[in-house]
């Protein structure tokens, strides 16, 4: 019975993807162990290569035991197992969020290396209920309260085939098949708000959980039928994103959309232009929306971006501030720099690296730069934007700025494209 429900879910979620490979994120907990066994049956039935990925966060003593256990199960099922390690660097600030991001970075990067397009995770019905309660406490809007069974991360599709299966059914499945699992001690700690909500839900009547699920479904329907199409229309009509890594928002067209969608549009642009993975909080975006309604020009900074109103348009471009992007050595044919730009070399170029333009560099080569196209496109903000673009150097010398076709030698040839690592539950930028 459980497998039939799982099979129906995964077939509906994947659709006509035509997969030959798939990966499953598996820890030692009951949810993901059940996912592994169910996914194995499905993969065998559909002649699909299943890879198993575990991430050790190096936070609990038994985590290595769990990874070893999953490796043994994978071996017994003739499935490849990959063990990854998250380095928390002894920084325990906002650890849950950082560990989650680190985990997904590691897993999706491995998927890209293995040419795997879909990653299965073990989020089940109880997780969705807890998430709804957490977001309700934070006064989230329609987008925040909604849930999704398909997400994107690092251009990998994240699929949750257990979304309508309660944890109790997964545990029952494991017990009936005499399959062992590990309990995470941190799940019983009052240190985390999620655990407190979980305990309250466990003590409540069944109708409370059923009512939350019903509310969630209503919100999801409203999002799918009204707000998601509106968001897509808003992006298509009001947003222009340029290869230089900046964007313009047409405020006249922007004005006709709902406030819920306006918040998402601003966040969409902030994530893409900043190269960050997380959206800005609503309380940070709200002042920008208020400024827009005042119909006066302004210049603010938020979320690693400069937001500059110029008449009826909003220009958004990268702001480095105190945190400059890391330099990247061009060892391979291409690299991603600042989580936004892909730089490709078309010839052997030893000892070169990608970095940002310094003021000293700019002074030395200023007279050789043709900034007219950038000046025209950016409403004369070229002098700021030029410092946000990738440049290629050998030692201390700038040899290329591909965006503006600057090369100090005819032998150099580099390509650059704007390729932000955009993460969203509602839209996918690829």
Swiss-Prot record:
Function: Ligates lysine onto the cytidine present at position 34 of the AUA codon-specific tRNA(Ile) that contains the anticodon CAU, in an ATP-dependent manner. Cytidine is converted to lysidine, thus changing the amino acid specificity of the tRNA from methionine to isoleucine.
Annotated ATP binding sites: 27-32
Domain note: The N-terminal region contains the highly conserved SGGXDS motif, predicted to be a P-loop motif involved in ATP binding.
Assigned keywords, A-Z: ATP-binding, Cytoplasm, Ligase, Nucleotide-binding, tRNA processing
Main location as per UniProt: cytoplasm
Protein's recorded name: tRNA(Ile)-lysidine synthase
UniProt GO molecular function: ATP binding; tRNA(Ile)-lysidine synthase activity
Gene3D superfamilies per record: HUPs
Localization in the cell: Cytoplasm
EC number(s) stated in the UniProt entry for this protein: 6.3.4.19
GO BP field: tRNA modification
Family of this protein: Belongs to the tRNA(Ile)-lysidine synthase family.
Source organism per UniProt: Rickettsia felis (strain ATCC VR-1525 / URRWXCal2)
Cytoplasm as UniProt keyword: yes
GO cellular component annotations of the record: cytoplasm
Family matches, as InterPro entries: Rossmann-like_a/b/a_fold, TilS/TtcA_N, tRNA_Ile_lys_synt, tRNA_Ile_lys_synt_N
Catalytic reaction list: cytidine(34) in tRNA(Ile2) + L-lysine + ATP = lysidine(34) in tRNA(Ile2) + AMP + diphosphate + H(+)
